[in-house]
Amino acid sequence: MVSLSLLLCSALAGLLHVASCIDVPDQAPLTVDECKCKPTSPKPVYAIAHRVLTEEGIQAAIAHGANAIEIDMTAWKSGWWADHDGLPTSGNVTAKAMFREVARLREDGAHLSFVWLDIKNPDWAISGRSSVAYLRKLAREYLEPAGVRVLYGFSNPRNSWGFKEIRNFLNANESVSVWMDSGDAKKIYAGVGRSIPVAQRVVDNGLFSLFWKPYIFDDLRRSSEARDCCTVGKAFGWTILAGQDRYVDKLLGYSGVDGLIYGTMASAYEDSEDTRAAAALISNWIKNHPDTHRVPTQDDKPW
């Protein structure tokens, strides 16, 4: 059968007096199904506890079924603290204390795949105990020997010294996430983040209330397609609140993300009706989709 390209070329050749045409078979654009890195089913879903800032919060998250936790990290002159707001009164637990508690619980049999460090001020210090290098040192001293991997999160990596420090010395237990829309994330990983291995590239996107960011579902779908086509390793969405089962379904089903941050809108994680209910939304969704999704085990490697 003569291809459309040959017919068009022949017509144009007649008009322009071109000597000959080459028959190039018609080709459809590359589809997601043709990409090489699409996760096999059933794929693991990571339930990530939001804004865990205390040892009690770590314990509660594990009790609720979280298999990863997100800790906001802020550097002060005295070092790194589990601190979201960066106010003199907002950080009460050091990074070291948080990491030691995670390691203790993991060694006691708790399943935590990774700790996501949402770094609020990665460029606060170039060296010393307030530098990103020191935060990494603590993670490697306490978390990684216990079998807990680390995800370093950045919101503005373009001109960040801290981002480059993590990027340049990344080991196999660590990965990097950028919080931005899929198009901007693509530029980061094609530019300043291009040396990061694909499996260790993460894209995350979300808001304290997904109601105010309705385009997020399509955008995260594009990030998941980038994962399927081997340009990033994982895509995560946030934040799932109690009663938002339709958002869980859309993010895990339509958007195809690998995990969800869940919890409350703007408070530290604790044992409460709201956090328990939000965690249950994810676990129940997985139970209802056993052919395509599953709870990860400690043997699963997120990167």
Swiss-Prot record:
One of its GO terms (molecular function) is sphingomyelin phosphodiesterase D activity. It is found in: Secreted. It comes from Coccidioides immitis (strain RS). This is Sphingomyelinase D. Residues 1-21 form the signal peptide. The lineage of its organism: Eukaryota, Fungi, Dikarya, Ascomycota, Pezizomycotina. It catalyses: a sphingomyelin + H2O = an N-acylsphing-4-enine 1-phosphate + choline + H(+). Its EC number is 3.1.4.41. It comes from the Eukaryota. GO terms for cellular component: extracellular region. The SMD-tail motif is highly conserved and may be responsible for structural stabilization. Belongs to the sphingomyelinase D/phospholipase D family. A motif (SMD-tail) lies at residues 296-303. Mg(2+) binds at E70, D72, D118. The active site is at H50. One of its GO terms (biological process) is lipid catabolic process. Binds 1 Mg(2+) ion per subunit. Its cofactor is Mg(2+). Catalyzes the hydrolysis of sphingomyelin. Sphingomyelinases D are produced by some spider in their venoms, but also by arthropods such as ticks, or pathogenic bacteria and fungi. They might play a role in pathogenicity through different mechanisms, such as membrane destabilization and host cell penetration, but also pulmonary inflammation and cutaneous lesions. Keywords: Hydrolase, Lipid degradation, Lipid metabolism, Magnesium, Metal-binding, Secreted, Signal, Virulence. SUPFAM superfamilies: PLC-like phosphodiesterases.
